[in-house]
Amino acid sequence: MFCVQCEQTIRTPAGNGCSYAQGMCGKTAETSDLQDLLIAALQGLSAWAVKAREYGIINHDVDSFAPRAFFSTLTNVNFDSPRIVGYAREAIALREALKAQCLAVDANARVDNPMADLQLVSDDLGELQRQAAEFTPNKDKAAIGENILGLRLLCLYGLKGAAAYMEHAHVLGQYDNDIYAQYHKIMAWLGTWPADMNALLECSMEIGQMNFKVMSILDAGETGKYGHPTPTQVNVKATAGKCILISGHDLKDLYNLLEQTEGTGVNVYTHGEMLPAHGYPELRKFKHLVGNYGSGWQNQQVEFARFPGPIVMTSNCIIDPTVGAYDDRIWTRSIVGWPGVRHLDGEDFSAVIAQAQQMAGFPYSEIPHLITVGFGRQTLLGAADTLIDLVSREKLRHIFLLGGCDGARGERHYFTDFATSVPDDCLILTLACGKYRFNKLEFGDIEGLPRLVDAGQCNDAYSAIILAVTLAEKLGCGVNDLPLSLVLSWFEQKAIVILLTLLSLGVKNIVTGPTAPGFLTPDLLAVLNEKFGLRSITTVEEDMKQLLSA
């Protein structure tokens, strides 16, 4: 096992990365190794998808499957070894079908890629794990060095984050052939074990630029189906009655669940990154979407144990449900998996609803505590002139984009302290689950404009980027000249690709934490600092002073 893709990875003087029987996320060495094997199979599939496009062949089954299967290897998504192998087998079957299509056009069609003809050696998981050793990401570290390995992983993990957003967009009916062609090209190239530093740096920026387009179609999919989010108050306390909790990012799953629970007497609560759903008109119209439950994903083993109903996980993040003894009432959807947990193959939630009706639910309603969400792209752009007016009248000094992933590390309290230290004449724009560090606190307003503005899920960084570009255009300056600072927390691969997106767009002087990615060497961090001004957090006092004086 070698996995260094998330923020909580093991860090030692000898090197970084989880390489024992189990990773810090709970992933076993078996599952981790089989995920490496799956990635190799997906690289071979992409190599043939690139070749097929040369013949004008676009296989939509391949295009829809490839990012979805890659998504299953993202942190805290799928811990089920047999399902990972199932994805690998499907990748090979699709590859062979695509290969046959190519050969039907050109009998001499071939692909020069070491993954292009990969076959699984056995049905036995142990044998497959031994085969996977050929594809462990650091297998040639001694030959290429830590810097090249780090750049490879930056590209691989960044592309994995983009693949997750591609799947979210695809579920909502969004498809862009150019994006899929670019994805396959990059995925196939990474399967050749590239070792050119400049080419890898260029690839990382290409991934960032591609992901901006992915976020654009995801935004179109969400707003096209569910309307543009508008500011909405959400209750974060319990309401009496039977209940279901839904977590993850998939708004379509939430919509289907709301439709199927309507009139059943079962209330629905959002959790984690599903919180922004309350801002969408076509979702909040369901009166039994009664509120948001819990806090950051890392607290789920305590909070889920206390929730008196079933739980549905639609995407990341799931962690071991046996710890809180709720594994008999947690359900996985789509690419999510945990051994022994019931999985919903389709969009029928009747079994979950039946379980909810058999459980006690909340016995009484607590005193409501309301927070505000729903500052989507249209709302943000509608406030652009107000922001400019406040800045011109020196009522608004600075805007801090304070968001990203949450996690268990104690140093993450920095983000709570930073939020509460932001001066009263400054505004906090937040997104993603890092907001749970401070989103239940009171921040007041500046002439009626809330000082805490919740823009949505991690992918809604797109809205923040569009706002920044709009403000810069209206003020006749560059984005980096705005009174705007980005202080981002990271945990997994979606955050990595958001960072690459920002860097590829030329955004500079981003501050990240709580620690630097374990796969980035001091040399690589120095390069990123020199090129983009990217740096790690220090103390709240020092960072606040530096950012306000910039």
UniProtKB/Swiss-Prot annotation:
Using the record, list the residue span of the signal peptide; answer none if the entry has no such feature: none
Residues binding hybrid [4Fe-2O-2S] cluster, per UniProt: H249, E273, C317, C405, C433, C458, E492, K494
**Entry EC no(s):** 1.7.99.1
Cofactor note as given: Binds 1 [2Fe-2S] cluster. Binds 1 hybrid [4Fe-2O-2S] cluster.
Q: Which UniProt keywords apply?
A: 2Fe-2S, Cytoplasm, Iron, Iron-sulfur, Metal-binding, Oxidoreductase
Q: Where does [2Fe-2S] cluster bind?
A: C3, C6, C18, C25
Q: What GO CC terms are in its UniProt record? A: cytoplasm
Which InterPro entries would you find in this protein's record?
HCP/CODH, Hydroxylam_reduct, Prismane-like_a/b-sand, Prismane-like_sf, Prismane_a-bundle
> Where is the PTM Cysteine persulfide found along the chain?
C405
List, in alphabetical order, the Gene Ontology terms for molecular function in this entry: 2 iron, 2 sulfur cluster binding; hydroxylamine reductase activity; metal ion binding; peroxidase activity
Q: Which cysteines are joined by disulfide bonds?
A: none
BP-aspect Gene Ontology terms: response to hydrogen peroxide
Localization terms from the record: Cytoplasm
User: What HAMAP family is this protein classified in?
Assistant: Hydroxylam_reduct
**What role does it play?**
Catalyzes the reduction of hydroxylamine to form NH(3) and H(2)O.
Q: What name does this protein carry?
A: Hydroxylamine reductase
The species this protein belongs to is Escherichia coli (strain 55989 / EAEC)
Write the lineage as a comma-separated list.
Bacteria, Pseudomonadati, Pseudomonadota, Gammaproteobacteria, Enterobacterales
Q: Which gene encodes it?
A: hcp
